[in-house]
Regions:
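Membrane-embedded alpha-helical segments of inner-membrane proteins
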Residues: 1-148
Length: 150
């Protein structure tokens, strides 16, 4: 069961990573054109892109949450299998797994096919933004306050 949970979390991380790249890689002129034609995915993506701080916020909150949870589960699995030296080995293996399957590959696919990634992913992103809005709002406030001194 832990392995299934771990795999699901890596897939969730891949979703967030690809969503970020897909949304940010959309051609704005084509997006505007499709929005005028009432393309549902373009309308959703456009709405999300109107507030990029909230979009990036919800993506980063989701991605960090699933990555930390995946790390915890991976450590539990490794300790059960290997024992004490597991945390170091887990960190190395998890870094490679996340880089390959949850970062580089999904982001590359999204950069190549932004519309195919961004439009469908906008459905869940809108839902997550509604659910996590208070957290996103708070993170953005703290982040903006930290930028005042820069």
């Amino acid at each position: 069961m832990l392995l299934v949970s771990f795999a699901a979390l890596i897939l969730a991380s891949a979703y967030f990573s690809s969503s970020e790249t897909g949304m940010m890689s959309l051609n704005r002129y084509r997006l505007k054109h499709l929005k005028r034609e009432k393309h549902a995915g373009a309308m959703r993506a456009s709405r999300l892109l109107e507030k990029p701080d909230k979009l990036i916020g919800v993506i980063l909150i989701g991605n960090n949450f699933v990555n930390f949870l995946a790390a915890s589960i991976a450590t539990s699995i490794a300790i059960a299998i290997v024992g004490d030296p597991a945390p170091i080995a887990t960190a190395i293996i998890l870094t490679l797994v996340v880089l390959i399957f949850a970062e580089v590959t999904p982001k590359t696919i999204a950069a190549l096919y932004p519309e195919k990634v961004a439009y469908p992913s906008s459905i869940l992103l809108i839902l997550l933004l509604k659910i996590l809005y208070p957290v996103v709002w708070m993170v953005n406030i703290v982040s903006n306050l930290s930028l005042i001194h820069i």
